[in-house]
Amino acid sequence: MKRAVVVFSGGQDSTTCLVQALQQYDEVHCVTFDYGQRHRAEIDVARELALKLGARAHKVLDVTLLNELAVSSLTRDSIPVPDYEPEADGIPNTFVPGRNILFLTLAAIYAYQVKAEAVITGVCETDFSGYPDCRDEFVKALNHAVSLGMAKDIRFETPLMWIDKAETWALADYYGKLDLVRNETLTCYNGIKGDGCGHCAACNLRANGLNHYLADKPTVMAAMKQKTGLR
């Protein structure tokens, strides 16, 4: 039996990963992390979606220690979430240091326990957000370290790594879940479901990708299929 664990926030990317994983694996587990995030409404959204889509199990892990250690606008109400700035340089203040290191490591421990062969995460380098822990190089390095440390070949899969946000919408549509992803996920840094606040970087990236896809579905769908190997 093929099993996978999806790092699941209830946002566009991880929900698309879950939708695909449910088609590719016999048993899919979801793991969501409560780190005291500003947009913690995503936890309830993740619960609803994991149940609705048919995950075998869904665990919400308390990692609020991260909130104490990592200073970010996503962990501190006193730090405002910035509006989207297309020319902004450097690491944005929405970056939570160590978040993906912790999430992927804990997800791998869970995968070990449930005998899953893969941990799936929705990080992406094509629409690079300025987050160093979304890079392919980082994921591969951590995967190698975790496999060595557990003496077990647990594979980190990043199905969205080389597709852009428009193509991510196409992937959801390929599996017949575009409307669900658009209306029932929570990507917004300000914790607003669906189309979100419309101002933060997460909402801007999501909206631009959707508009691009809806404007030229055949071309974007073809590009997505070529990059992912889907037919």
From Swiss-Prot:
Residues where ATP binds: 8-18
Residues holding Zn(2+): 188, 197, 200, 203
EC nos: 6.3.4.20
Cofactor(s), by name: Zn(2+)
Annotated protein name in UniProt: 7-cyano-7-deazaguanine synthase
Summary of the function given for this chain in its UniProt record: Catalyzes the ATP-dependent conversion of 7-carboxy-7-deazaguanine (CDG) to 7-cyano-7-deazaguanine (preQ(0)).
Cofactor binding, per record: Binds 1 zinc ion per subunit.
Organism: Escherichia coli O139:H28 (strain E24377A / ETEC)
